[in-house]
UniProtKB/Swiss-Prot annotation:
Coiled coil: none annotated. Produces ATP from ADP in the presence of a proton gradient across the membrane. The catalytic sites are hosted primarily by the beta subunits. GO terms for molecular function: ATP binding; ATP hydrolysis activity; proton-transporting ATP synthase activity, rotational mechanism. It comes from Alkalihalophilus pseudofirmus (strain ATCC BAA-2126 / JCM 17055 / OF4) (Bacillus pseudofirmus). ATP binds at residues 158-165. InterPro entries: AAA+_ATPase, ATP-synt_VA_C, ATP_synth_F1_bsu, ATPase_a/bsu_AS, ATPase_alpha/beta_chains, ATPase_F1/V1/A1_a/bsu_N, ATPase_F1/V1/A1_a/bsu_N_sf, ATPase_F1/V1/A1_a/bsu_nucl-bd. Its main location: membrane. It is an enzyme of class 7 (translocase). Keywords: ATP synthesis, ATP-binding, Cell membrane, CF(1), Hydrogen ion transport, Ion transport, Membrane, Nucleotide-binding, Translocase, Transport. It catalyses: ATP + H2O + 4 H(+)(in) = ADP + phosphate + 5 H(+)(out). This is ATP synthase subunit beta. PROSITE patterns: ATPASE_ALPHA_BETA. GO terms for cellular component: plasma membrane; proton-transporting ATP synthase complex. Belongs to the ATPase alpha/beta chains family.
Length: 470
């Protein structure tokens, strides 16, 4: 085995000297065993990833764990390969760190479980699927107005407490129940408490059995936060390439991936770029995002929560992410305050799949009519607030009348929220969604009370609820 020794420790950056001509390759993992301070202390293994070659015999590495207690002269062992993580069935229902070590207090991962390196090339052109397929989620507002593409990348925007986590859980549940699909959740630089809550909520709702979770949270060194998204993606790619699955990959939060890269870049001594970000920002983002795609075998569809610093959409971090997105799902606090769940903004959410060539003429036409009706209602709200409904023309009154029904019908009960609401969750196929909204637009249900449309699934449930209310 190729061994070197530590010559310098600068926070999470460690320099290691090897014999001349025996430098480990870039991205190789080095192992350093930190001997316990006394006989009762446990020896700790720190993993370092090679980032730079310094001259003929030294490398600069980034630590994946705490470097507290590392000293010059400590031996570092070159593993001869990049960091690798366990893949396949053994990962389902488990929680891992960036190195693929189980952190859920369960049994350690068996030694014979297959492991894949986290650094790999994106699929080649000839492997990519050329057809654009819609991923049915069973969530009406998403399927109708901002449909997800298999192998696409979706940005999830929303402040605290508007329902990002519940929406993520419902997507995991629906993909598992209706499509038998696998989900991988990568927690990148977010709060440990949120990860813990999510794990327990998913265990309670039963979706954990179809999910692998990887966490590199806020308290971790920047190296771990920068690489944990790749660890999660590697697990997802295995399910796509070996098992032909349509996999959902959740990344929460993609901004923290960029932020960690910026910290590492500064520590490695690179010249900062705009707003202090790393000069390699676009390259790093591209290397991650290009691996998320659909091939002829299966697909990895990614849903990425995106934090926008100071609500500035021109900031280089979110702006670089936008270039890769196929759809956006915007959560709006005003809607959640009105009790409309999921609180997805039907006018701000977008998808490049919403075109007649991809979703079909009928779907496109109904979606656009729904948006036009809601937009007109939005414009009339100021007049209603000042003068009241009586001052509107008959035509405008009808628009408001239908828009409110549409707005309520965009809500639905979620399976994962059943234990809190006591209401049965609903999965609505796209055909049923289109049929329901088409009939509302045609005025077929103008006589039914508004409340009959709130938090229901299919249009038949509205009719049933309306009869009970009459």
């Amino acid at each position: 085995m190729n061994t070197g020794h530590i010559t310098q420790v600068m926070g999470p950056v460690v320099d290691v000297k090897f014999k001349s001509g025996q430098l480990p390759e870039i991205n190789n993992a080095l192992k350093v065993v930190q001997v316990g301070a006394d006989k009762n202390a446990v020896d700790v293994t720190v993993t370092l990833e090679v980032a730079l070659h310094l001259g003929d015999d030294s490398v600069r590495t980034v630590a994946m764990g705490s470097t507290d207690g590392l000293v010059r002269g400590t031996e570092a062992l070159d593993t001869g390969a990049p960091i690798s993580v366990p893949v396949g069935e053994a990962t389902l229902g488990r929680v891992f760190n960036v190195l693929g070590e189980a952190i859920d207090l369960g049994e350690p991962v068996a030694a014979d479980v297959k492991r894949d390196p986290i650094h790999r090339e994106a699929p080649k052109f000839e492997e990519l699927s050329t057809t654009t397929e819609i991923l049915e989620t069973g969530i009406k507002v998403v399927d109708l107005l901002a449909p997800y593409i298999k192998g696409g990348k979706i940005g999830l925007f929303g402040g605290a407490g508007v329902g990002k986590t519940v929406l993520i859980q419902e997507l995991i549940n629906n993909i598992a129940q209706e499509h038998g699909g696998i989900s991988v959740f990568a927690g990148v630089g977010e709060r440990t408490r949120e990860g813990n809550d999510l794990y327990h909520e998913m265990t309670d709702s039963g979706v954990i059995k179809k999910t692998a979770m990887v966490f590199g949270q806020m308290n971790e060194p920047p190296g771990a936060r920068m690489r944990v998204a790749l660890s999660g993606l590697t697990m997802a790619e295995h399910f796509r390439d070996r098992d032909g699955q349509d996999v959902l990959l959740f990344v929460d939060n993609i901004f923290r991936f960029t932020q960690a890269g910026s910290e590492v870049s500064a520590l490695l001594g690179r010249m900062p770029s705009a707003v202090g970000y790393q000069p390699t920002l676009a390259t790093e983002m591209g290397q991650l995002q290009e691996r998320i795609t659909s091939t002829k075998v299966g697909s990895v569809t990614s849903i990425q929560a995106i934090y926008v610093p100071a609500d500035d959409y021109t900031d280089p971090a979110p702006a670089t992410t936008f270039a890769h997105l196929d759809a956006t799902t915007n959560l709006e606090r005003k809607l959640s305050e009105m009790g409309i769940y999921p609180a997805v903004d039907p006018l701000a959410s977008t998808s490049r799949a919403l075109s007649p060539e991809i979703v079909g003429e009928e779907h496109y036409s109904v979606a656009r009519q729904v948006q036009q009706t809601l937009q007109k209602y939005k414009e009339l709200q100021d007049i209603i607030a000042i003068l009241g409904m009586d001052e509107l023309s008959e035509e405008d009154k009808l628009v408001v009348h239908r828009a409110r029904r549409i707005q309520f019908f965009l809500s639905q009960n979620f399976h994962v929220a059943e234990q809190f609401t006591g209401q049965k969750g609903s999965y609505v196929p796209v055909k049923e969604t289109i049929k329901g909204f088409k009939e509302i637009l045609d005025g077929k249900y103008d006589d039914l009370p508004e409340d009959a449309f709130r938090l229901v699934g299919r249009i038949e449930e509205v009719i049933e609820k309306g009869k009970q209310m009459a």
